[in-house]
């Protein structure tokens, strides 16, 4: 990713991640962002992808284009909307709808001794899972639940949604954790339901009902 605009360059930090991974590179692409009179232009390998974007939205759109192409290349994988972590060597997934608190939970688990690999997306193939290396998208209104990151959160890349609320792109490695992406089998699956402000309860659930 490259750009001719210093403001856009700062926004690219929202996308760039630094997770350790040892998978072969199957393809390389060059994305460019140029500032124009009518907004920002995104190019992929020299060809236009999208134009007329403002500074607040282009990072989201660029990430959408990048991830879309990645999913085409690794089409043999099944995507699961899930966080991924390990405890004492046992890998588990945290599945749930958008807004239930997966990212907040996965970030908090980092500070509770868990190895956390992703907050949003996991790829599955041949019985093994590969966490998708994307920065954790922490909503500004959940920061009161994550006091550990408050001292440095203002230095973390962020974008603003349509309502002006900030969404921070958090990297575990920037907080001193080992952010590692590797394929492993899953031992447990947790399905998270919204219960904001209520008591946390863990219940056993048969696989067919969870599906």
Give names to the regions the model predicted.
Residues 14-17, 64-68, 111:
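Short, intrinsically disordered, mixed-charge
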Residues 1-60, 73:
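Long, basic/Gly/Ser/Thr-rich N-terminal segments
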Residues 105-106:
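Post-Walker A alpha-helix
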Residues 39, 80-84:
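Short, acidic/polar N-cap/turn motifs at the starts of alpha helices
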Residues 58-79:
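N-terminal pre-Walker A segment at the start of P-loop NTPase domains
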Residues 102:
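Conserved lysine of the Walker
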Residues 2-12, 83-96, 111-211:
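Glycine-rich, often acidic-flanked micro-motifs
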């Amino acid at each position: 990713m490259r750009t001719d605009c210093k403001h856009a360059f700062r926004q690219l930090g929202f996308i760039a991640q630094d997770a350790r991974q040892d998978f072969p590179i199957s393809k390389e692409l060059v994305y460019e962002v140029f500032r124009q009179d009518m907004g920002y232009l995104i190019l992929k390998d020299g060809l236009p992808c999208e134009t007329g974007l403002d500074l607040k939205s282009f990072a989201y759109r660029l990430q959408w284009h990048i991830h879309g192409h990645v999913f085409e290349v690794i089409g043999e994988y099944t995507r699961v909307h899930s966080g991924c972590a390990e405890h004492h060597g046992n890998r588990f997934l945290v599945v749930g709808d958008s807004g239930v608190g997966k990212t907040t939970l996965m970030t908090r688990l980092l500070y509770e001794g868990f190895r956390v690999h992703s907050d949003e997306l996991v790829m599955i193939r041949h019985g093994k899972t590969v966490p998708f290396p994307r920065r954790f998208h922490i909503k500004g209104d959940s920061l009161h639940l994550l006091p550990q990151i408050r001292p440095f959160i203002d230095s973390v890349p962020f974008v603003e949604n349509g309502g002006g609320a900030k969404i921070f792109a958090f990297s575990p490695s920037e907080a001193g954790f080992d952010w590692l992406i590797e394929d492993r089998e899953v031992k447990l699956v947790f399905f998270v339901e919204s219960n904001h402000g209520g008591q946390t309860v863990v219940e056993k659930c048969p696989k067919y009902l969870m599906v």
